[in-house]
Amino acid sequence: MGILFEPYQVESCCLCGSGESLTGEHKIKASALRKIFGKDAMFIGNFDGESIPRLAQGPKSRAFHFSARMCSLCNGTRTQAADHEFDRFHALVFSFLSEGRDPSSVFSLPQYTSGSEDYLNVFRYFAKLLCCHVAESCGPRPLEACEFAIGQTKRNIIFLHIDVDPTYEAYRHKLGEHRFAAHGGLIVPFDSKTQNPASFRSSISLGPVRYIFWVRFEAIAGIELRACHYEFWRKCEAAYQEALKNPLSDEQRHRLGI
């Protein structure tokens, strides 16, 4: 039994740990993809000028699903309110951005007063995505984030930044307005002093809007990852060492939201 994390298990729900009635979860909601792309063809890739994008079969393509599993309860009843609230939240954010307003000012609306149920449900949606990204990387289940995602606690540990996706902007300057969606995978920043993970971080982009979301760790969390989940820690540490040897450019960091 872990203190802050539970070991990764392939055939277990990445939110509650159950092994029953396992289903899949979209990296980007199928309804959001349908709204953005309609019936137009979709291509999957890094769009970095190096790799070649490939054709996606449609919004329900397996390419848009996490390999990590989620039980039917967590994928339904326990997270449904957060899913629906994110839809409403994103519609408002997109509207604010379209009007030239700061998208983060959506939190000035009365329904998103800090600590309100609507406010918490927005952050629960991002907590769910972050837990899925950790499981996708065979990482241990972050218990506090998981409990928050499924509504077992009201303590919000998720940080959020909203901006315009730089990849979308780059293509807009070349091609004009276009259809675009993306996710940022999992980024695990390291603390240079402790040499342990300091955060889990990811992002999702829907059209021009990018949401960057993360959790921060106290030192004890990094220690537990290293001591009790060494294989995952070692994979993260190898990526950290590679980043030290080959630092990202300012443009790459901006593109990743770092």
Model regions: which residues?
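C-terminal, charged low-complexity interaction regions
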Residues: 135-258
